[in-house]
């Protein structure tokens, strides 16, 4: 086996990717496209379980498919696990949306979609811990956008969130979104 970063191009699908701390690649299998994220086994299993539980609550997230473990390179050294999720058809990361000529109010509509997602997640007891435009995918929904959670590795599903947890997510969202929009305005697409 090979680290995900060295998989041959003929196995991969060239789709727009957001910014990630981890190696993420898209693979075509049959009629479906899957996102592969290389992370530690514990994080992969925890994120898989969180996404599965959020899906059962009918919240807008990517669909978790599997965690691939027990991988080794040709020298027998262990490789990180891979979290496999189903790619959300027709979705785009925010940077890909801004790379196109869009309406001037696009940023506002994306932030609105992210706010709706965060409220829905909070009402279900999900503490995100890393709210940002980078951790969601967007689908066009008539004249607006819908946001879908793609990165749940810092999250936690609880019975109820504390006021402090909600405030932290809101403050972090504000900070991260300002930074992401500043990056875009400086031309750092």
Regions found by a protein language model. Give the residues of each.
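Conserved ATP-binding subdomain of kinase catalytic cores across diverse folds
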Residues: 2-108, 112-129, 145, 176-178, ...
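Catalytic activation segment of kinase domains across protein kinase-like and atypical kinase folds
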Residues: 127, 133-183
